[in-house]
A protein has these predicted regions:
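Conserved short histidine dyad/triad with adjacent acidic residue
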Residues: 13-33, 41, 65-68
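Double-stranded beta-helix
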Residues: 3-9, 14-18, 82-90
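Ligand-binding loop in jelly-roll beta-barrel domains
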Residues: 67-90
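Short alpha-helix capping/helix-loop boundary micro-motifs
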Residues: 31-33, 50-53
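Short acidic-glycine-tyrosine-enriched beta hairpin
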Residues: 51-69
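Basic nucleic-acid-binding interfaces
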Residues: 44-46
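Well-ordered beta-strand positions
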Residues: 39-41, 57, 65, 75
Length: 90
């Protein structure tokens, strides 16, 4: 499966960019092996959802901590989503 984003890595940080034209079926529920901090660098109507929770809007400057093995997903908005991901060793 091809990732629904482009990514640039720099040490333990990665910049991911999602385009608004991404197919919604590619934005799947998933969980990560490591705890992550996600900083929103750019968002236009994108939302974030934890399993069994109501989606919340992602705004530029928001910082999320996603614990390892926690199901979550993003929901496409009207423009790009650009995030900075920092992974932590648990």
């Amino acid at each position: 499966m091809v990732n629904p984003y482009t990514e640039v890595a720099d040490g333990n940080k990665r910049i991911r960019t999602f385009d608004s034209s991404v197919d919604a079926t590619e934005l799947v529920w998933h969980r990560d092996r490591k705890t992550r901090q996600v900083k929103v660098l750019e968002s236009a109507g994108w939302r974030f959802q934890y399993d069994n929770k109501i989606p919340t809007e992602l705004n530029t400057g928001d910082v999320l901590r996603i614990e390892k093995e926690t199901y979550h997903r993003v929901i496409a908005g009207s423009g790009r989503l650009v995030i900075e991901i920092t992974e932590y060793e648990d």
